Amino acid sequence: MNQVMIANLMVSLSQTEKLQEGLVRHMVLNSLLNYRSEFKKKYGEFVLCYDNRHYWRRDAFPHYKGTRKRDREKSKHNWDNIFELLNKLKAEFLEHLPYKVVEVDGAEADDIIAVLCKQQGLANIRLQNNMQPPVKTLILSGDKDFIQLKRYGYVDQYNPCLKKWVEGLDPKLYISEHILKGDRSDGIPNFLSDDSCLVEGRRQKPLRKVLIAKWSTQSPEDFCTTPELMDQYERNRKLIDFECIPKEMSEKIIDTYESLVPANRSDLSSYFEENELNDLVSAVNYF
């Protein structure tokens, strides 16, 4: 949900420099209405997944997403006000929307999505054992981190910003390359580089495409020629590969999801009326 909300918020800021709470609320809810109308029949009901402020990855790697604060400081936008609004809308959606809204201490939305996709796989095995078709899962996000989840044949991914399906990439090869290259946007260097090079603004050690192509098909023991390289490879694997989500975090996500009771759909009209979402009142039965 963070991506959906920020995308709508940035569109609103492109129209006016002032942050308009009502406009952002309306845009986000209208997006949800459109997605539900398009995808519910095939994929079932929404699960809205949110990042928690505390990340287990930052406990494991203190520089995780360490470059983002610096980038926000360079931005012309007031990110304190933006986060305040996003948190307010999240609380409203948890209270009023008739869907499971999931936030777990220590987890990112990526973790929640990955764990629930894997959990659906176990449920699908039981369905198939009973001669029933598996349940399809759709990830509504353009984030390429989710390509690795497409190794599960029942998972599809749709990029709502580009309005196109994410497909054509080998999930196994993609995750292998991703571990080697790291993720600059998350402050994760390539595996040849030390922990702090990105947050300190230093250049990473060059990693040629020909070596990525070669090593992505090999075991790390074949090319990590020193203990330091192996440690840095494992650093990246732990942060990037969803198979490395800690067991206790996975269990907490499942417990939280299963305990959630969505808000009553019959109360949705009152929420829309209170916030002057008049055109959505007439569409309330489609939420």
Please report, for each region that a protein language model flagged, where it lies by residue.
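Low-complexity, acidic/Ser/Thr- and charged residue-rich accessory regions of DNA metabolism proteins
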Residues: 242-243, 247-287
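Helix-hairpin-helix
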Residues: 142-148, 168-231, 240, 246
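Noncatalytic, basic helical substrate-engagement surface that gates or grips nucleic-acid strands
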Residues: 1-138, 151-164, 241, 247-248, ...
